[in-house]
Regions:
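Bacterial carbohydrate/catabolite-sensing allosteric modules
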Residues: 1-26, 71, 112-117, 165-171, ...
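N-terminal helix-turn-helix DNA-binding module of bacterial transcription factors
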Residues: 1-87, 360
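Short beta-strand segments enriched in small/hydrophobic residues
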Residues: 39, 44-49, 84-99, 199, ...
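Amphipathic helical "hinge" segments at domain boundaries
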Residues: 59, 72-139, 143-147, 227
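Short hydrophobic/charged patches on amphipathic alpha-helices used for structural packing
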Residues: 80, 134-137, 161, 197, ...
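Short beta->alpha connector loops
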Residues: 127-130, 151-156, 274
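Acidic, Gly/Pro-rich loop/turn segments at junctions of secondary structure
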Residues: 147-159, 174-181
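Catalytic-core regions built around general acid/base machinery
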Residues: 158-166
Length: 361
């Protein structure tokens, strides 16, 4: 039995005609350098010079070639050009979780700077799945990317380690890396955690819990910062750590566990803003008012943190600045692969909003 038929309709925007072949059926063949040369009345080699941006072409001939290319709808063959130049001007960015606003906002800064350096960005989403990570990196390598950015992902698999050995790579948010020629961009996560706990202690809180993000070294460093700060304030007996998974749902589940204890915490420091929003949801579900009954602090200062009615107190790590820093490191390493590995650490700041207040009892 034959399968169901599928009808496909293609709609073109007004003012743009679908190129068709001379017989009227299907798209016409793609124009070639030869077609551009014939239309402009120049040689194929001169067309190649113009398309490569060579300065050794008169302005008159350059404009003639560009005009012919526009009229024909010619697009240079990126694969062929990369074989000639030895570069594709492509960068592959592999992201642990595109649902996390921090990663999306980081990519804004990364793409902005890469574009200024003449590089184009390809993005893959691993969804925290090691198999997806390997597949995405292999796809990037098949496209002969000039460089890799691993965001929230440590190169631990054989595929990723091998890739970093011959492809310029920058890792963001992971510190536990001992690979030559790999640059790192991180936030001072321990300092950020201490800022959060100091703020809560100043408000009179003692029973301060932490929901730990378990999927990255950043999460571990934030937890260590929490532990150090609690002990420094002589609050070790009140330490409470609940495991989370860096999502709103994970924050809700962890918060339910914490907030049904007796005595319950009066404040929660969450691994990131997404987890903190899950905490807010759990508090509302249990009839707790924020900040009157419970203070909540997130981490990242994503755009969601400042939205109403959330108004989340959070630790700001400059996401776009981190993206720009990663782009600079990568561009430098593409130009000089033999550079010594470098680490760029940004300094976080506490942003106080309405989700924190004085401890009640």
């Amino acid at each position: 039995m034959s399968g169901p038929s599928v009808n496909t309709t293609v709609t073109r925007a007004r003012g743009f005609a679908e190129p068709v072949s001379p017989d009227g059926f299907g798209p016409r063949p793609r124009p070639t350098i030869r077609n551009v040369a014939e239309r402009a009345g120049v040689s194929k080699s001169l067309v190649s010079l113009v398309l490569r941006g060579s300065p050794h072409v008169s302005e008159h001939r350059r404009q003639a070639v560009l005009q012919a290319a526009r009229e024909l709808g010619y697009r240079p063959n990126a694969v062929a050009r990369s074989l000639v130049e030895g570069r594709t001007h492509l960068v592959g960015a592999l992201v642990a979780d595109l649902h996390n606003p921090f990663y999306a906002e980081f990519l804004d800064g990364l793409q902005e700077s890469l574009h200024g350096d003449g590089l184009r960005l390809l993005i893959g989403n691993s969804q925290w799945d090691p198999a997806f990570e390997d597949e995405a990196v292999e796809a990037f390598l098949e496209l002969r990317v000039d460089g890799l950015v691993l965001l929230g992902i440590a190169p631990t698999s054989e595929t990723l380690i091998e890739a970093t050995g011959y492809t310029p790579t920058v890792v963001v948010g992971e510190r536990d890396i001992d690979l030559g020629g790999v640059d790192i961009v991180v936030d001072d996560d321990q300092l950020g955690a201490r800022l959060a706990i100091d703020h809560l202690v100043e408000l009179g809180h003692r029973r301060i819990a932490h929901i730990e993000g378990t999927r990255s070294s950043s999460g571990r460093f934030r937890c260590e910062g929490y532990l150090v700060a609690m002990r420094r304030h002589a609050l070790a007996p009140y330490i409470m750590v609940e495991q989370g998974d860096c999502t709103e749902e994970g924050g809700m589940l962890a918060a339910r566990s914490l907030l049904t204890r007796d005595p319950r915490p009066t404040a929660i420091f969450a691994a990131n803003d997404a987890v903190a929003i899950g905490v807010l949801a759990a508090a509302a579900e249990l009839g707790l008012r924020v900040p009157e009954d419970l203070s909540v602090i997130g981490y990242d200062n994503t755009h969601l943190a400042g939205a109403q009615p959330i108004s989340l107190t959070t630790v700001d790590q400059p996401r776009r600045a981190m993206g720009r820093s990663a782009a600079t490191l990568l561009s430098d390493r593409i130009g000089d692969p033999g550079k010594t590995s470098r680490l760029r650490q940004v300094t976080p700041e506490l942003v106080v909003r309405r989700s924190t207040g004085p401890a009640q009892g």
